Amino acid sequence: MTIDKKPVTAPESDSKSAAGRKYWTQLCTPILSSLLKSSGSYSAEEQETHIQNLSDYVIPNLGPRPSEAHTKSFLTQSGSPFQPSVNFSSKKTQVRYCWELLGPQGGSDSDPLAVEAAQDILSQLCKAFGYSTRWSDTWLSAFAPTLEEAKSVREMLPKWIATFTGGAELPALKRVPFVFVAFDLDGAKTSMKAYYNPKGKEIATGKPASDLTWKVLRSLTPALSSTAIDLVEKFLAERPVFSAVELVGIDLVDEAGLSDARVKLYVHTENNSFNTVRDYITLGGRLQDETTLKGLAILKDIWHLMLQEPDGTDDDYNKPVNDSTMLCQRAYFSFEMRPGRELPEVKTYLPTWNYVRTDLETIQNYEEVFRRCGFEWGKESKYKELFERAFGPANHDRPKPVHCDASYLYSEKKGIYQTLYFSPPLKDGEEYE
């Protein structure tokens, strides 16, 4: 595939855009560079390639610096629209990052939910990397609120959010996010995924996002297995959760690659007990193959550590969250489907930030996770060194933890497959208004 090296850039017509690019360069570049080096998986030339792609395709589209921004990002707890992550497996360690498509006007009165920004930036990215827009355009069309709907969401958000919070008072929110893009860095190659949030459309129309999601899943070409779709739909219908669908993610690939591309449906639950995890991973007992059960047994051994409970828990324990206004953010699951695959693959996610006591304690818990999984990152202070080189001292007094989310998957091909996601602290005392 030939990559169009013309940068996907926001307009450079004013000092605000230039200041934003400078700020995000100073924040994001050292972090990505540090993680690439610490992982031990990338040559110097490969590292340079990924830093250049960050500069060309991402930095220009993160929006103004926080003190001048129209909105903060909801991708991270710090408000950063850039979320780095590290994938740990029995093979090599890989660095990834996700970012929110905001551009110069995302979150402003002219683009309240950053819909126009996402459409423009995603179109340019697909053109630059030679990706098909067939699936992407389908999800954009289905989930994109009109400008009038986007403006109405601002007024409707407080009532909608109160459904999750039990009446607890929240800071005023003006929007929900719309599109994220993830870059997975493998050697010199970058593969991409796009994530589409149906919440804006759901709030504006009052129609459950799940109804629209099933309709779109069944309309895609190449077609996904109807067996897989029916299986997930029935499972979720038996476990009704308000506004359960969080995101739909797809692989961004060229036209030929669509025949093996993934679609991932993300849902949240209101319970984080291991019994809930078992229920979702096995689809209520429907999946009982050797790989599923082996992965479940491994996860059972580390689940209490992922919940930041090093002394252990029983299988029924539903841990309280740090932020009682975020009752919906207890645990997440994704159901991965591909054309021709009859059964979905289930991946588990935890919003670690809602369980963290301190980043230092979380590091200790994850080093124990890595030891139990047989990863070299469990050696004394190895993971801590990676963390501190990228984000500074683990023992800090920042208001938000750096550890953001975590995911777990076990597959026959890859073995244990775990990713840790981070909220980069903002620089220079910057804050969002």
Curated annotation (Swiss-Prot):
Pathway in which the depicted protein is active: Secondary metabolite biosynthesis
Primary enzyme class: transferase
Record carries keyword Transferase: yes
GO biological process, one term: alkaloid metabolic process
InterPro entries, alphabetized: Aro_prenylTrfase, Aro_prenylTrfase_DMATS
Molecular function via GO: transferase activity, transferring alkyl or aryl (other than methyl) groups
Keyword Hydrolase: no
Disrupted-gene phenotype: The disruption of the whole terpendoles biosynthesis cluster abolishes the terpendoles production.
Entry EC no(s): 2.5.1.-
Keyword terms of this UniProt record: Transferase
Purpose: Indole diterpene prenyltransferase; part of the gene cluster that mediates the biosynthesis of terpendoles, indole-diterpene (IDT) mycotoxins including terpendole I, terpendole K, terpendole C, as well as the kinesin Eg5 inhibitor terpendole E. Terpendoles biosynthesis begins with the synthesis of geranylgeranyl diphosphate (GGPP) by a yet unidentified GGPP synthase.
NCBIfam families: arom_pren_DMATS (TIGR03429)
Family statement: Belongs to the tryptophan dimethylallyltransferase family.
Protein name: Indole diterpene prenyltransferase terF
